[in-house]
Amino acid sequence: MLRKVRLTLGMLCLVFVTLLFVDFTGVLHAWLGWMAKIQFLPALLALNAGVILCLILLTLVAGRVYCSVICPLGVFQDVVARLGRGRKKMPYTYSKPKSWLRYGVLAVFVLAMLLGVHALVALLDPYAVYGRAAHSFLQPLWMWGNNLLASMAERMDSYAFYSVDVWLKSLPMLIVVAVMLVLVVVLAARNGRTYCNTICPVGTVLGFFSRFALFRITIDKEKCNGCTLCARNCKAACIDVKNHAIDGSRCVACMDCLDKCHKGAIGYRFAYGKKAEKAETPAPETADRTAGRREFLAGSLLLAGSVLKAQVAKKAEAIKMDGGLADIVDKKEPVRQTPIVPPGARGLRHLQSHCTACQLCVSACPNEVLRPSHSLDTFMQPYMSYERGYCRPECTRCSEVCPAGAILKIDKAEKSSIQIGHAVWVKDLCIPLTDKQECGNCARHCPVNAITMVPSDPSNPDSLKIPAVNEARCIGCGACENLCPARPLSAIYVEGHERHRVL
């Protein structure tokens, strides 16, 4: 019964978190946004003491329920482990705890947080690992499905669906995500929860508390006949049947062992005052797993990446011609001295110190402005660029979805008064000066009237007009940069502010 309850709740949590990352409309966040906010590391970085306290108390009462129910990467590993074992259900075997590795990784993780090595912190956070995988592989599939429905509906004169662009936001991040995903999948398919009990820093922290849990899975020595059914079904490899011991720090409370014991020797019981036993039996040799299944999983990931790349290339080729009459040159990103980060982030330093690079804000951005950074010091964290859109003053989506406090929640009025950067005019690229043609596109579309058109020749009021930027009024939304007709570089671009200002 407990196993069925755990499976049901775990699958619901996995589906809810996945829907958060694949949804591009923003509709689901109003209902499911709390799922991201109860994840351990985002809550810690957001200084959400209530959530952290509840998770620790839950662990002290019931063990590592967080790992078996709430953590999306943990539940995902259970799914992979089930598929990886196949119909023959290759047995698991007990292994000695690799405490030196677990606490070594945790020490490196804490040191990285203290020293500001944010890329390493983001790389190890289990919630962010799953979020990036869902964003990189599942959201494009979701969008392609939506585009197919939109195409079919349009033929029937229905516009219930609308097409969205599917494009590769960051190749370096995609490679990192694929490598991490393959690592997790291979470990889960071969040995269950190996990743959780050797690499995951959140699992190590909660494992320390779970040793003192009030309710734990224990073995009744009087009833146990040593059949090893429980150990052969333990994904955490923490049951030592020979010594009737269960390593409480590694048990993820999956409850799989409970239904396997026909003698009632193993159970989830009140264990206050009983120290969690540490088994010391040498690890038996692990049974070989089917190589073909591993190759299939790896091949599937490579195929998904190839399909995504092919679709992006096809889309890019399709938009290069304007009705077959003129070439359309894609905009290139200008070289900025300071990256632009979203309103609500307060500035580059605040975003760096709080962001887990989960990509939830990138998934939710409706204007295609946010994308993962390639820079080493902010790797995979979001930054803004305006080649495909601009940050509309009425949009506050990213601040609404961020679970880690990296982008603080703001309303529309607050956003209109936050200066994230200022526009810079490039004289040598401006069309009135290069092509001797009237333009003024930037001034017409500036939502805060920070750009005015002035004569290019002060002595001749009738000369072609060029833009003049009022930096004190500009909020850095990027409308001017995005809508500038100059190619491949815009004649006006936004330079970011290291620290945001309030106008």
Question: What kind of feature is each model-predicted range?
Answer:
Residues 1-244, 249-250, 256-503:
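Non-ligating segments of multi-cofactor redox enzymes
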